[in-house]
């Protein structure tokens, strides 16, 4: 996944590798030229001093220029790769079913698309700017240091063993900690998101302190975990520096006796110290970058987990079809993910094209669940749902969206314009089509009063509209494509009785050939339906006209009489 994204920018990556090679060559050659300059100083060979000095300065400038170019290349690659991964992750999430979303939860997915992608961007920047350079520079410096002073090989070996041990301990300690840190980050993001969405409820019941306490608990856990990681790295980095500088002291202590015995070794010793300094530099950088690299690796795994997830529902790749509006449930049993108890149990019924069907029942009876099976937001565990005699699992996603439209109880609007929101129902909806949909939904009145009409702005979550206005726009979005089956999931609950009646009259007049499924809390909303389905604890316990059910169905009659009594 990560390397596949890198391949799209292979020429930038290869250019970065070339610059890295020049930087490494510059770093490895500088101590070698320094050795020869010192030898020339001892021999008082001015010609060699000038020529080698010129090479030294030239190579230094090449390394500096290569470093500057490489920073630009690394920044471009990191931003491009992270942008591609963010888009790929978002595109993948768009294919997820409700079950997939519930598996991760929305807050978790938001963190993965933001924080985790940022971590990947950082580690990509590190990779091309520093990480690719470190191992080659380390190996090259080790080899040249040993070649320069073979008798001091044991100092290099001891240094490598100690650093390898420290790195192994660090990775073993930090891996689980970073994973827990990301989990807590997901959790605190979910709490914040939930609180902001439900801010009216929080303030209505004066629960600010409770919400703060809940947030504070997770925040304290997150702080504790972050502090542990910080403390660990604050110990590991100085330890690596201590090991590195101890090796320099050990080398100087050993070399001091050698210089007294053989003064001509000064140039070799200076070169050796130069290479040893580069070895220590790579060690310190490993300690310094370990935090970011470990986080980046975990973030790559988390993004890979999303991209590797197969959608819970697959749609056949077939041409879009026009279907008649008949609907049938055949022995349908359904339970939500992670729920043991079925929400719907052995449901069977048939609907003829153009009929109006009401669905009633107590809260939790399964009305909305039944509605969500019709546009195939979920698949039943048993039985089948058919439209036009065709099993939903045989239909392409385009066919379903073309023929079936659902208007949910909770009116969800997207930031943009009114036209943008209506075109969620039909991508290329014309102005006359939107005006017709608005008339049906009784939204024309307030839209026409707005200065920019259908081009008027919709703020985030439709916060600049009332509940009734949002619900009417949601209904308009549902009818704009003139569907063969329209599902209204208690979608007139925010409307007054007059507006609700006008919407129903407009639906009957304008969508005469459309099969309409109305999920209702109030029986008055479906009293004129061709057929009413009565649900109770997930079972279909009755179906018929209003008059038939009042006469024969105890549950329906009880609901009707209770509501009638309240109205009286």
Predicted regions and their residues:
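Juxtamembrane helix-loop junctions of ABC transporter transmembrane domains
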Residues: 18-19, 26-39, 59-106, 110, ...
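An intracellular "coupling" helix at the cytosolic face of ABC transporter transmembrane type-1 domains
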Residues: 8-10, 95-99, 115-124, 128, ...
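Helix-loop-helix
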Residues: 44-48, 58, 144-158, 228-302, ...
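Short intracellular "coupling" helices and adjacent cytoplasmic loop segments at the cytosolic face
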Residues: 43, 79, 87-111, 115-117, ...
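ABC-type nucleotide-binding domain
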Residues: 323-568
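Hydrophobic alpha-helical transmembrane segments of ABC transporter permease domains
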Residues: 7, 18, 26, 30, ...
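Transmembrane helix-loop-helix hairpins at lipid-water interfaces of multipass membrane proteins
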Residues: 7, 13-69, 73, 146-151, ...
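A short amphipathic helical element positioned immediately N-terminal to and/or at the very start
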Residues: 1-8, 109
